[in-house]
Amino acid sequence: GVDVSIAEYEKTTALTAKRMDAVYGYVVIEYKGPGKLASAAAVRKAKDQLKTYLEEESLRHGAETESSLEKAVGIALDDRHILFARYSKTARILSTPVPIEGQGVLFPEVRPQFGFHYQGPFPINASSLTSLLIYVRAAARRPLTAADLATVFGPEHEVANVLVSELYSAAMRGQRRSQFPRVATFYAEWDRLFGVVYGEKLEKAEKAAEETAMLYHLPTGIRLKSLLFAIHTFYAFLMKLIAIELLALQRDARVDSFVEGLAALDDAGVRTRLSELESGSGFQDRGISNFLEADFFSWYLDAWTGKLASAMRGAIRAMADFEPATPVLEPDWTRDLLQKLYELLVPKMLRHGLGEYYTPDWLAGYLVTKAGYDGAPGVRFLDPACGSGTFLVQAIHRAAQHAEKQDTVRIAEVGRAILDGVMGFDLNPLAVLAARTNYLIAFARFLPYVSPVSIPVYLCDSVLPPDREPENDNHQAELFSPDTVVF
């Protein structure tokens, strides 16, 4: 279920001549008597009240009035119905955190708009009450944004430097000692494959080793490859936690959070639960068939120690403070999430030494526009070197925006069209994991309606495409159809 134990107890606040029944952070709740939302006139009155309450509450924040208003949620409910209100300063279409039972179409007869948005009234049921509880919980949790993640998981902070230090030590032990053969095997395979990805750039990046070590509060004289292996493992671990929490929310509101209570287990219990995570079974149980494939970053389970368990608990406990519903509540906040997180974890000098340069979100959007892709169904979008999935995310948003312009479009149809039409390849296993996670984040609003899901991001070398037999004696078969935008 949805844990709201962290939310403050409701308080009553009087504004001008009116009274707000309760405020949870930025959530304003107006309680109505039985049957008071049964008529159209009563609903109009409730909307006006919520609008007034939210505007007056936002004035308390002075210069932050408009931004606080965008973060506010108004809720009116009686014994049978519930109504939600949000504000947007730009033209948008807003949705509830989880789909309300009975909704069969995507934004029926709704166009993007700015100002106040009203959703409902909906019947009070499990899904509408879950949305209410998620709004309440979100008011007490940190948003899942790159800036907020950086304040906890950035290398200058304890969670990151303690865990990376322990992972580095574990990787070094695994290479030196025969009792950790799986660690040595994973490292050797990572070294081989990333040698193909980075080529001679790894040697050129050695001069960034000391800077990276200082960033993570490690002593001088570290081995760059082993440190990069540890940082990659840390980054992969964070992505897996983000993805499993998002799926726990979207697949079934009654599926428990993965991280909730995990840090309270003993060392063996934490390892058992993380083994389940790394096996991919948790993702498969939640309808994602291929999230973890050819993953090099579960090796730490074979180098498990008390110190490593303690460091893992620190990261798990910190992740539990973030709201997994952020990609649904505020989709724009989570764009570039993993790219920016990686840029924080791997310093610029090392990234550039490795030849890693990321495309800014605004430039990716511009290039997708110039390529002529508008998200129309029937047109496929392929990025054959997708990296962390920046262009794939842009394509998914274009497809959703195209759907929003229609009068009525069924959510499942849009979601399936995206899965069939937006795909990527990459040779880098870490990039594939990042792209799949970014794909899930961008696809979050469709997850409840499409199952099972196979994320169309594949680990392969697009420079060496598979051979195909000619369709006839005179014509070579086309690898891609004419309606595919190859990026």
PLM features: residue spans?
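A short, conserved, highly charged catalytic patch centered on acidic carboxylates
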Residues: G1-V73, H81-L94, L106
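DNA-processing P-loop NTPase/helicase core
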Residues: R142-A268
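Mixed-charge intrinsically disordered linker/loop segments at interdomain junctions
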Residues: E57, H61-Q175, L274-S281
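Long recognition/docking surfaces used for binding and targeting
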Residues: L247-L344
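Short, glycine/acidic-rich hinge or "gate" loops at secondary-structure transitions
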Residues: E66-L69, D252-L265, P448-S454
